[in-house]
C-alpha cells in the first residue's frame, strides 16, 4: 500500500524546459550547520526569520552561497550580524545568491509569505484555519530562502508564535518550551537533535485533541506517542495508536532500530494533500490513513492504516536518519521503506498462510500497476537518469518495483544477511545523504558477495521476460531446466545487459510431493527448494535422481519481479494450485 503519496501529487507538465540529469550532480559548495526558524503566524502575512550557519566546503568551486526561494517576499538580509548592502547578493528567478562566503558565517534572512493564498499546498499553507506544511520534495523554498536539496542536512530550532486561539503549535523534534507571550499570543520552541534535510521540516498550528501513550523502548528509555486530530474525530485513533506501538516494537526486534526521540507525533487532518508524510518526529497524514470507526470501517481500512502508519514510522531510519543524496535516489528511501512496510504487515498476520496471502496481494499490486508502466511509453528504471519535474518520480516503479529490488537482497542473503547489510548501511551513513550504490555496496560487503551485475536493476527499465524450457530424461533420471532472459530494448538506449536474477524453484513428482533437489556435481540432495542465480542470457541446470515425471514450480515466493514464459497446460496449473508447497 504505497499509493498514498503519489495519488494526490499534481503531475508536472512534460513541456518544462529544464531537464535535470543524474550525471550532472555536484556536491554543494556550502553546508548548513544549523538553522533557527522563527514564525509569526498571520494568515495572509506570516513573517519568517531564518538564521543559518553556512560552512564553506574545502573542495568548493565557488564562494557564492546559492539559496532557493519561490513566491517569497524578501524583507531583509544580515550577513555576520551586519545589514547587507548592494553587491553582497543577487536576486535571480528562484534564487538568492550571497557572494563571498569564504568562512563559517551566520546569515539572517527575513521573508513574508501568504499561507492563506498558497493554493499549491506546498510549503506552509492553511487548511480550514489550521497551518500545515508539506515540504517534499521542494516545498521548503516556499517558506524561506535555503539550499533546498536533500544533501544539505542541518539541525533545526523552531520558534512558533501565533494568536491565542491557536493552542497547539507543533514542529519536529522535542518540545523545549511553550507558553503565553506578553501580547497574549501563544508560543512554542522545538529543537530537533538530529540533522535533517529541508524536505523533512514540518510545522502544524491549530486546535486539536491528542491521544497519548507512553512506551518503554528496548534501551529502557520512555517515549511519548501522540496522535493529534481535529476534535470532531476524537475517539477514532486507537487502532492507529496500537499500529504505531507495533511498528516501533517490530523495528526494534527485526532490525534493532529504536525510536530515537523523546516524543513521536502524528497529525491527522482531513485536508492534507500528500496522503502521508514522514517528517522527522512529526508525521502528517490525511485522516483516511489514521481514523477508524469500528462500526463502519472495513478490514481493508484497518489494514491500510496499519501499513501506512508503519511505512511512515519506518522512514525514521530509512529516509530520515539516512536520507537520499539527490532525488534520483528516491527509491533508496521509498523502495526500501515499502519493503519494510510489507514485511511488517506480513509479520502482523502471524501464520505462514496469512503471510503468503499478503505476499500474493503485494505481487498483485505490482503486476496490475507496475508491470504495465514498465511495458508502456513511461517506462523508467527505479533510479532514473533525468527528470523535468521531481514530482513525476512518485511512481509504482520507484515504489513497488523498488521494493522488489530490495527484497531480492533478502532473497539472496536471507533475513540475517539482509539485516546485517541494512545495519552496516545505517552505521556508515547515519546523519548523511546516501545513494543507491551506497546501499548496494553495504549489502555486498557485509555478505562478501560481488553485486556489480545486480546494479543493473537500478539502471535498466522494463520487466525481464524469462523463457522456460524443461527436459526430463527418464532413463538417466535427470531433469534439465534452461532459462533465457529477454530484457526490453528502448530506442536510442544501449542494448540491455543480462541481469542478475534470483529464481527460486522446486520440482513436484506425479503425486504432488516436492522432490529432493540434487544438482549435477553434488554428492547428495539439499532441500526441496533451490535458489538459482540467472546472470547470463541463457543458462541450464541439470538435477539428478528425478525418477518420476516432474513438474516445475518456478518463481517461488515471487523471487524476482519478472515474467516467466512457460508452457504449462491448464491441467498442470491446476495440479500446481492443488499441490505446490509454495
Language-model features: locations:
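Non-catalytic accessory/interaction domains
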Residues: 2-4, 9-12, 27, 78-82, ...
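Hydrophobic alpha-helical and helix-loop surface patches within well-folded domains
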Residues: 190, 221-475, 481-483
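Extended, low-hydrophobicity, Ser/Thr/Pro/Gly-biased non-transmembrane segments
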Residues: 110-214, 236-239
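Intrinsic-disorder/low-complexity, polar/charged segments enriched in Ser/Thr/Lys/Arg/Asp/Glu/Gln
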Residues: 34-36, 45-51, 62-64, 95, ...
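N-terminal, polar/Ser/Thr-rich
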Residues: 2-47, 125-134, 146, 150, ...
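Short, hydrophobic/aromatic-enriched beta-strand segments in well-ordered soluble domains
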Residues: 48-54, 69, 101-119, 156-164, ...
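A surface-exposed beta-strand-loop module
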Residues: 57-65, 69-127, 148, 534-549
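Surface-exposed beta-strand/loop patches in extracellular or lumenal glycoproteins
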Residues: 53-71, 145-148, 154-163, 437, ...
Amino acid at each position: 500500500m504505497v499509493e498514498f503519496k503519489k495519488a494526490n501529487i499534481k503531475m508536472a507538465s512534460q513541456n518544462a524546459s529544464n531537464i535535470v540529469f543524474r550525471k550532472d550532480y555536484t556536491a554543494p559548495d556550502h553546508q548548513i550547520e544549523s538553522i533557527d526558524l522563527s514564525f509569526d503566524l498571520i494568515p495572509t502575512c506570516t513573517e519568517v526569520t531564518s538564521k543559518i550557519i553556512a560552512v564553506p566546503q574545502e573542495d568548493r568551486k565557488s564562494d557564492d552561497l546559492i539559496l532557493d526561494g519561490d513566491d517569497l517576499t524578501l524583507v531583509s538580509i544580515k550577513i555576520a550580524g551586519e545589514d547587507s548592502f548592494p553587491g553582497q547578493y543577487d536576486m535571480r528567478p528562484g534564487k538568492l545568491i550571497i557572494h563571498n562566503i569564504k568562512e563559517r558565517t551566520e546569515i539572517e534572512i527575513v521573508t513574508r509569505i501568504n499561507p492563506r493564498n498558497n493554493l499549491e499546498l506546498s510549503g506552509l499553507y492553511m487548511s480550514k484555519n489550521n497551518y500545515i506544511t508539506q515540504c517534499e520534495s521542494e516545498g521548503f523554498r516556499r517558506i524561506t530562502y535555503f539550499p533546498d536539496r536533500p544533501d544539505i542536512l542541518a539541525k533545526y530550532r523552531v520558534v512558533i508564535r501565533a494568536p491565542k486561539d491557536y493552542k497547539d503549535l507543533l514542529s519536529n523534534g522535542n518540545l523545549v518550551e511553550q507558553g503565553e507571550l506578553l501580547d497574549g499570543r501563544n508560543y512554542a520552541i522545538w529543537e530537533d537533535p538530529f540533522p535533517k534535510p529541508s524536505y523533512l521540516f514540518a510545522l502544524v498550528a491549530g486546535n486539536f485533541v491528542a491521544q497519548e501513550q507512553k512506551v518503554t523502548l528496548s534501551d529502557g528509555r520512555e517515549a511519548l506517542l501522540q496522535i493529534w486530530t481535529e476534535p470532531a474525530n476524537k475517539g477514532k485513533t486507537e487502532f492507529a495508536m496500537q499500529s504505531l506501538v507495533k511498528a516501533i516494537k517490530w523495528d526494534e526486534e527485526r532490525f534493532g532500530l529504536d525510536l530515537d526521540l523523546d516524543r513521536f507525533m502524528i497529525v491527522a487532518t482531513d485536508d492534507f494533500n500528500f496522503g502521508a508524510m514522514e517528517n522527522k518526529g512529526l508525521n502528517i497524514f490525511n485522516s483516511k490513513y489514521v481514523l477508524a470507526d469500528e462500526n463502519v470501517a472495513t478490514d481493508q481500512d484497518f489494514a491500510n492504516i496499519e501499513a501506512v502508519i508503519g511505512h511512515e514510522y519506518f522512514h525514521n531510519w530509512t529516509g530520515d536518519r539516512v536520507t537520499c543524496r539527490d532525488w534520483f535516489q528516491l527509491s533508496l528511501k521509498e523502495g526500501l521503506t515499502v519493503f519494510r512496510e510489507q514485511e511488517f504487515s506480513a509479520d502482523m498476520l502471524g501464520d505462514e498462510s496469512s503471510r503468503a496471502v499478503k505476499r500474493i496481494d503485494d505481487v498483485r499490486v505490482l503486476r496490475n500497476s507496475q508491470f504495465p508502466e514498465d511495458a508502456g511509453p513511461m517506462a523508467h528504471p527505479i533510479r532514473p537518469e533525468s527528470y523535468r519535474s521531481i514530482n513525476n518520480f512518485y511512481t509504482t516503479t520507484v515504489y513497488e518495483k523498488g521494493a522488489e529490488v530490495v527484497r531480492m537482497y533478502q532473497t539472496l542473503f536471507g533475513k540475517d544477511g539482509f539485516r546485517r547489510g541494512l545495519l552496516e548501511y545505517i552505521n556508515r551513513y547515519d546523519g548523511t545523504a546516501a545513494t543507491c550504490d551506497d546501499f548496494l555496496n553495504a549489502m555486498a560487503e557485509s555478505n562478501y558477495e560481488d553485486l556489480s551485475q545486480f546494479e543493473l536493476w537500478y539502471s535498466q527499465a522494463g520487466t525481464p521476460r524469462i523463457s522456460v524450457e524443461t527436459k526430463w530424461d527418464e532413463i538417466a533420471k535427470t531433469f534439465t531446466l534452461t532459462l533465457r532472459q529477454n530484457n526490453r530494448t528502448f530506442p536510442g538506449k544501449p542494448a540491455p545487459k543480462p541481469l542478475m536474477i534470483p529464481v527460486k524453484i522446486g520440482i513436484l513428482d506425479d503425486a504432488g510431493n516436492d522432490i529432493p533437489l540434487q544438482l549435477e556435481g553434488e554428492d547428495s540432495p539439499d532441500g526441496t527448494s533451490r535458489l538459482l542465480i540467472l546472470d547470463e542470457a541463457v543458462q541450464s541446470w541439470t538435477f539428478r535422481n528425478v525418477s518420476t515425471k516432474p513438474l516445475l514450480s518456478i518463481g517461488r515466493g515471487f523471487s524476482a519481479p519478472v515474467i516467466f514464459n512457460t508452457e504449462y497446460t491448464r491441467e498442470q496449473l491446476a495440479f500446481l494450485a492443488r499441490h505446490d508447497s509454495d
